[in-house]
From Swiss-Prot:
Signal peptide: 1-18
Full protein name: Foldase protein PrsA
E.C. number: 5.2.1.8
UniProt-recorded Gene Ontology molecular function terms: peptidyl-prolyl cis-trans isomerase activity
Gene name of the encoded protein: prsA
Lipid group attachment sites (N-palmitoyl cysteine): 19
Length: 278
């Protein structure tokens, strides 16, 4: 996530570099003087120029051989959202979705290059598929004690509205105001007792009170993804299994080799050591 916080600077530098020819046009004017495009560009280059240039070189070299689809970027975004939650949302607010998607695309290009020579067996792929659980979408009502949980469940059994009761009773500040909606989640994202109960429910079905360390939950599954066939998931599974075997040093060395083979020539004397810095 940290590198995404540089994304605004990256985009600004790229835009300014296109028009930087000793440009004295002001980007900011004050009563104490102006800040020119040239001054702004040079300062940006000094602060983040080498990082930006390395990213641009990697993208240019890798995109010639490897392709990343919008669907792959979407899947990666979902994975990142599950792992980082509000940090991802903050990155999008600060930098814009387009910039974040470009950063993710570059990460996937690097990963595809690095995993190219990693071997996986059919057994490993089948095992991953068998253990894979599609995402579910659920709502819940969280209360502190079993007595209250049973009272709420009785109201639900009589046909009262789940979302309305969630707003009235639920002690989960993150979902109560949304009628208890937790959104989509996959395996391993909830505590064990909650997850097991949610995955057993059919769409529209409501659980009995489930006890966890947080209290008592009443769960309603509102939607479920359908599990694709192995053949339809094979490419995605192969990538994930290979990536699980990858270490950062392997990725860096593979990308470095491809960049070296591309015979990159850096003409800006201030940035000529970019490829020597890791």
């Amino acid at each position: 996530m940290k590198k995404w916080m540089m994304a605004t600077a990256v985009v600004s530098l790229m835009a300014l570099s296109a028009c930087n020819n000793g440009d004295s046009e002001a980007v900011v004017e004050t009563k104490n003087g102006a800040i020119t495009k040239d001054e702004f560009y040079n300062e940006m280059k000094e602060r983040v120029g080498k990082t930006v240039l390395r990213d641009l070189i990697d993208e240019k070299v890798l995109s010639k051989k490897y392709k990343v689809t919008d669907e792959e970027i979407d899947r990666e975004i979902e994975r990142i959202k599950e792992a980082y939650g509000t940090q991802y949302d903050l990155a999008v607010q600060q930098n814009g979705e387009k910039v974040i998607r470009e950063m993710i695309k570059l990460d996937l290009l690097r990963a595809k290059a690095a995993i190219e020579d990693i071997k996986v067996t059919d057994k490993e792929l089948k095992e991953y598929y068998d253990n894979y659980k599609p995402k579910v979408r659920a709502s819940h009502i969280l209360v502190e004690d079993e007595k209250t949980a049973k009272e709420v469940k009785a109201k639900l059994d009589k046909g009262e509205d789940f979302a309305k009761l969630a707003k009235e009773y639920s002690q989960d500040p993150g979902s109560a105001s949304n009628g208890g909606d937790l959104g989509w989640f996959g395996a391993g994202k909830m505590v064990k007792e909650f997850e097991e109960a949610a995955y057993k429910l059919k769409v529209g079905e409501v659980s009995d009170p489930i006890k966890t360390d947080y209290g008592y939950h009443i769960i309603k599954v509102t939607d479920k993804e359908k599990k694709k066939t192995f053949d339809k998931m094979k490419e995605e599974i192969t990538f994930e299994v290979k990536r699980s075997k990858l270490d950062p040093s392997t990725m860096q060395s593979k990308v470095d080799k491809l960049v070296k083979d591309a015979n990159v020539k850096i003409k800006d004397k201030d940035l000529q050591d970019v490829l020597e810095q890791q």
